[in-house]
Amino acid sequence: MVNDLTPHFEDVQAHYDLSDDFFRLFLDPTQTYSCAHFEREDMTLEEAQIAKIDLALGKLGLQPGMTLLDIGCGWGATMRRAIAQYDVNVVGLTLSKNQAAHVQKSFDEMDTPRDRRVLLAGWEQFNEPVDRIVSIGAFEHFGHDRHADFFARAHKILPPDGVLLLHTITGLTRQQMVDHGLPLTLWLARFLKFIATEIFPGGQPPTIEMVEEQSAKTGFTLTRRQSLQPHYARTLDLWAEALQEHKSEAIAIQSEEVYERYMKYLTGCAKLFRVGYIDVNQFTLAK
């Protein structure tokens, strides 16, 4: 266990508080910034993002009146979908000021009797009991040294029949790359350093084994693991295409340097998923 459980506000805000207008140039209308799920070949990105959200929510066993905690809630699409489809109360946690403001505004505009809150806070600061937990694309930012604490906190605030749906990018150890026949190239080393320093400071994707072992130690039972690897390559391709189509606007909102950096990130990550250096998995963890 680590002693300093202060959320990584600066690391997260360095990326996610760049500019909502900039992200809107390449994200779908739901502003979902994670892997989509293309159930059908003819799906639009928006349809595939909603399908991914439905895939995650469908694994939780939600019932009307339950309270769902969304850790790393982004711009709120998962919570709004949960209210609409499952009639549940929601609490969202984000470390991004821009996201918190966006979610609060969208909540204020909703016509529903269900409770809905968004907090500018990390899981480290949240101790309220909830019925279910979903976390999509946030675990990668926690750091390996906080995995045990995260699972302990999730286990503590869930009821005896509670479920945690963890959707996270997963990586390979150097030895696993060798075992899979993946070349350890200079490009790979440089690109991973670029991602860690210029795109997601503090980001540390876990291995599949890390998630399975740490969650089990806390008392969770893994009931299902589902890989969406090819879906993330396609998602990133579509983001890169959209950003390229809006190049002039992107440069006007930010700069040419930021535009080029994001194009390098999106196209490079698509390659990593396509070749198999990284994966993305949904872990269904029952208490």
Swiss-Prot record:
User: What does the record give under GO molecular function?
Assistant: cyclopropane-fatty-acyl-phospholipid synthase activity; methyltransferase activity
Knockout consequence? Answer: Disruption of this gene suppresses a cyclopropane group at the distal position of alpha mycolic acid. Mutant produces fully cyclopropanated methoxymycolates, but the efficiency of cis-methoxymycolate cyclopropanation is reduced, leading to accumulation of unsaturated methoxymycolate derivatives. Cis/trans ratios in purified ketomycolates are unchanged. Cells lacking both cmaA2 and mmaA2 genes cannot cis cyclopropanate methoxymycolates or ketomycolates.
**Catalysed reactions, as listed in the record:** a 1-acyl-2-(9Z)-enoyl-sn-glycero-3-phospholipid + S-adenosyl-L-methionine = a 1-acyl-2-(9-cyclopronane)-acyl-sn-glycero-3-phospholipid + S-adenosyl-L-homocysteine + H(+)
Give Gene Ontology CC terms.
Answer: peptidoglycan-based cell wall; plasma membrane
User: Which residues hold S-adenosyl-L-methionine?
Assistant: Y33, S34, G72, C73, G74, T94, L95, S96, K97, N98, Q99, W123, E124, I136
Pfam families hit by this protein = CMAS
Top EC category: transferase
Q: Which superkingdom heads the taxonomic lineage of this protein's source? A: Bacteria
Known regulation of its activity is: Inhibited by S-adenosyl-N-decyl-aminoethyl (SADAE) and thiacetazone (TAC).
Q: Which SUPFAM superfamilies match?
A: S-adenosyl-L-methionine-dependent methyltransferases
UniProt entry keywords in alphabetical sequence:
Acetylation, Lipid biosynthesis, Lipid metabolism, Methyltransferase, S-adenosyl-L-methionine, Transferase
Pathway per its UniProt entry is: Lipid metabolism; mycolic acid biosynthesis
Is the keyword Cell membrane in the record? no
- Name the Gene Ontology biological process terms: lipid biosynthetic process; methylation; mycolic acid biosynthetic process
Tell me the active site.
Answer: C269
- E.C. code: 2.1.1.79
Function comment: Catalyzes the conversion of a double bond to a cis cyclopropane ring at the distal position of an alpha mycolic acid via the transfer of a methylene group from S-adenosyl-L-methionine. MmaA2 also catalyzes the biosynthesis of the cis-cyclopropanated methoxymycolates. Cyclopropanated mycolic acids are key factors participating in cell envelope permeability, host immunomodulation and persistence.
Similarity-based family: Belongs to the CFA/CMAS family.
What protein name applies here? Cyclopropane mycolic acid synthase MmaA2
